[in-house]
């Protein structure tokens, strides 16, 4: 891979798994970037003029000739950087496997990432309050629960969806080192990012040790700091694919 001379700017919430997903991709490709941490609520003042009205992070400012001023949505960001910086690739060489990798990425984004969010915020509002019992933290959690319609019943349904998904991911990772093909792909980094909040939930750490080992390995490959919760886990990081 040649040296990449650019300095992208990633607008993010530091705790967002979708922002983590973009950082993993940028790190794996060796693309220099900086992050600007936005304040939830106030972030819309920064984003709306850049995105034409969109309010969600991540937003990437490529700051490159011939590129859009801003790219919103983690999937669109991955498409953009894969097109602009194809090596090392985050897609299999086979076109049918490329389609499969994007299909799994979309499934993780639209279903499993949301299920993880429900389970995580249900935990943080109950048994996980001690992680950060501050008034501000609890206010943010309650606002998130209200915004996304999270309650005990919806969180229980999310647990069931998550359990089925983890079974599928486990089988795929057991069959090979990667979810699709024989190299790291957008599917792997999406799984590693969106499932990382589960490291703060003791029951998941007990029931799915293989998951957190794989998440740690992918973070090592991408040169990304491990998420909160991993400091209490015994997992290995690998920096070779």
PLM feature spans:
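Structured catalytic/translocation cores of nucleotide/phosphate-coupled proteins
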Residues: 2-27, 31-33, 60, 162, ...
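GST-like domain detector, emphasizing the conserved glutathione-binding G-site
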Residues: 2-133
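Alpha-helix boundary/capping residues
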Residues: 81-85, 108, 193-196, 218, ...
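Short, hydrophobic secondary-structure boundary micro-motifs
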Residues: 89-93, 179-182, 207, 227
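A short, terminal or domain-edge coil/loop segment
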Residues: 89-100, 121, 142-154, 229-241
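A non-catalytic, amphipathic alpha-helix used as a structural packing/dimerization or gating element
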Residues: 96, 100-103, 157-164, 168, ...
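GST-like fold's C-terminal all-alpha helical module
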Residues: 110-210
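Long, positively charged, glycine-interspersed low-complexity recognition regions
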Residues: 198-241
